[in-house]
Amino acid sequence: LWYSVARIEGLGKPHSFFYQVAGAKFGGSFDVPAFGPESYQQPGVPSGTLSEKIIHTSKIYDGMRSEYWIYVPAEYKPDAPAALMVFQDGGAYTDRNGNNPTLNVIDNLIAEKKIPVMICVFINPGDITDSPGTPTYNFVKGYGDKWQRTLKDSMRSTLYDTVSDRYVRYLRDEVLAEVASKYNIRKDSYSRAITGLSSGGICSFNAAWQMPDQFSRVVSWIGSFESIQWKEDPAIPDGGQDYPEKVLHEDKRNIRVWLQDGSNDLDVRYGNWPLANLRLATALKFKEYDFHLSFGDGTHSTAHGAAEFPEEMTWLWRDYDPTKTTQNYEMDPAEKTRPTFRVAITNR
């Protein structure tokens, strides 16, 4: 005899479940997304247009080839500059019927006027295979050989996990320059957001941290604020694990940040993902950043972030005024009244 007992959670959040037989738990999942209506195509809401795949060859990364897509909402008008949002691991966000129905959310929130009309750039990590002998190739190949990682995976880590301004310069000077030659995009960071998952999460935070004049709004899912590229390049002293201290001790950046993670995220030789995200959130709170931490019990998965993406976007773009080019981001008054984050051991 099989039976199930379920507690129905709200839409826009992930569900978890398990099976129990003779008093013993087995199977199940922490990450079953429960998409709300804003994650589905709605009657009467116009759909934007996703471009064909575009290939870019980088100078900053010595011939690395990247692919990206441009999403243009139906409301875009060439004579009105649009806001901008850049998605790392971009191909993961482009399927309306997939695990990350991002395009549906963007269409619906623009129609509801919860976010501005925005051009979205979905960019994948690059491939250095065709540029042997270049400094970038040699570094990436050496890193991959050292840690038994593929050339493509090592290129992604070099792009995303390195704590420097190189990647955001690549976006600014190469990719977004191409996009801006085709579409009317706002140049003020007040109108620019960036997001990613895992290493793409720290990459997005790092881009805004390094150049807050380019991006001021950040969403990080299961961000890898860890030591993945720490000391791999002797010229770069910091690793991702250093960001809590950088936030506490360096000049405050005018950025707005949403962090998402779960208690069952990774704990490996590079570090502990839940603790790293909690440490960063605590640092942001102490410095009174405009931030939000959404912390559940999920794993290293997009389920939590994707399920609440409408909420994330609404929060990220709240009080946006297209007549402005700047805003001094301040911590939400409700967050100021809340205590700092505490940690408890739950598995032993």
Would you name each region that the model predicts?
Residues 1-348:
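Non-catalytic cap/lid and distal C-terminal segments of serine-dependent acyl enzymes
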